[in-house]
UniProtKB/Swiss-Prot annotation:
Compartments in which it is found: Secreted
Name of the protein this chain belongs to: Serine protease SplC
Active site positions, chain numbering: H75, D113, S193
Pfam families membership: Trypsin (PF00089)
Assigned protein family: Belongs to the peptidase S1B family.
GO biological process, one term: proteolysis
GO CC field: extracellular region
PROSITE patterns per record: V8_HIS
E.C. number(s) listed in UniProt: 3.4.21.-
Gene (name only): splC
Major localization class: secreted
Broad EC category: hydrolase
């Protein structure tokens, strides 16, 4: 092959690689700016509270509510069975908090989109603090109540595969509470299903079930934890 042609081809490849790298960096920076405008931030350290109370499914979120016990949605749990796995607070690292098998699944008997799962205490893959689930996470406490205009945050795994299982936090306010339904304006995306809705004290108010209308809607929905729902959850927390 002509030596000059080889040199030119290698130079062109180097330029293309450089341009591709720059383009990827620009896209990532643009995405981060867009998230910032929506009051969404990437969590840097998921080994501290409240972030290590959140767990990831392959395409959704859950959170810890007691010993070996997590909450998510029915529309999430329907795709899982006993023996399937969840990951505790990953942040681009699948083993950050350990990987655990599901031991049981209990769906709320009403129409509300809530499911309680009990988890095997010993990890399939250890977390940063060993093989014990409860050593690697911290359970959330229930909020006493909530009202319209309260500040809230949502922590979870939006678009988990696309975002390489990085954890994100979005902030907003409560717009409406009616019976078991809570509406809020914090930004969410697919993958946030099962995320905790937290008050300013990091106490859990409810569980995200989805957006209302288009993706990224500013009017989103969660199941509000009424006394009846709290009682159901409490009965399924492992003692």
């Amino acid at each position: 092959m002509n030596k000059n042609l080889v040199i030119k081809s290698m130079a062109a490849l180097a330029i293309l690689t450089s341009v591709t790298g720059i383009s990827a960096a620009v896209v990532e920076e643009t995405q981060q700016i867009a998230k910032a405008e929506k009051h969404v931030t990437q969590v840097k350290d998921t080994n501290v509270f409240p972030y290590h109370g959140v767990v990831a499914f392959k395409d959704a979120t859950g959170f810890v509510i007691g010993k070996n016990t997590i909450i998510t949605n029915k529309h999430v749990s329907k795709d899982y069975k006993v023996g399937d796995r969840i990951t505790a607070h990953p942040n681009g690292d699948k083993g950050n908090g350990g990987i655990y098998k599901i031991k049981s699944i209990s769906d709320y008997p009403g129409n509300e989109d809530i499911s309680v799962m009990n988890i095997e205490e010993q990890a399939v893959e250890r977390g940063s603090n060993g093989f014990n689930f409860n050593d690697n996470v911290q359970a959330f406490k229930f909020a006493k109540d909530a009202k319209v205009d309260d500040k809230i945050k949502v922590i979870g795994y939006p678009l988990p595969a696309q975002n390489s299982f990085k954890q994100f936090e979005s902030t907003g306010t409560i717009k409406r509470i009616k019976d078991n339904i809570l509406n809020f304006d914090a930004y969410i995306e697919p993958g946030n299903s099962g995320s905790p809705v937290l008050n300013s004290n990091n106490e859990v108010i409810g569980v995200v079930y989805g957006g209302i209308g288009k993706v990224g809607s500013e009017y989103n929905g969660a199941v509000y934890f009424t006394p009846q729902i709290k009682d159901f959850i409490q009965k399924h927390i492992e003692q």
